[in-house]
């Protein structure tokens, strides 16, 4: 640039660091059904179906409360392995829980689908692969 070449040689500014987002993902099951929901029409993974999830990280003891359920509505909660998914500009660091319900409920604006419907009708984004492979 001192030589006056700065205007002739293109300069690529360094890439911004990806934003890290903590997320908690839930596999909510009742008998042979699994809860899913549709994402908002704008933003990341717009209008796609997903496993229910929330921003941030929560502990197993607070899962029923986070889902808006009473403890008697939840048969058990199992901590699942952590997972990571990298998008171009954001990175999800995910904690997962399997939540088995004692009665059919639809928390977090979800609806229940059979495992067969999940496999053949409702495609879930690759971001959830670490958890979708644990269903069924």
Enumerate the predicted regions with their spans.
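Intrinsically disordered, low-complexity, charged terminal extensions of DNA damage-control enzymes
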Residues: 1-136
């Amino acid at each position: 640039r001192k030589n006056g070449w700065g205007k002739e040689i293109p300069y690529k500014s360094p890439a911004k660091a990806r934003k890290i987002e903590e997320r908690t993902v839930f596999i909510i099951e009742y008998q042979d059904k699994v809860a899913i929901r549709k994402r908002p029409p704008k933003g990341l993974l717009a209008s796609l179906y997903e496993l229910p999830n929330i921003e941030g990280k929560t502990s197993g003891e607070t899962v029923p409360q986070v889902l808006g359920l009473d403890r008697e509505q939840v048969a058990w909660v199992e901590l699942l392995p952590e997972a990571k998914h990298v998008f171009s500009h954001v990175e999800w660091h995910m904690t997962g829980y399997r939540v088995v319900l004692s009665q059919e409920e639809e928390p977090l604006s979800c609806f229940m689908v059979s495992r067969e419907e999940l496999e053949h009708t409702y495609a879930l984004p690759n971001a959830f692969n670490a958890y979708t492979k644990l269903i069924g």
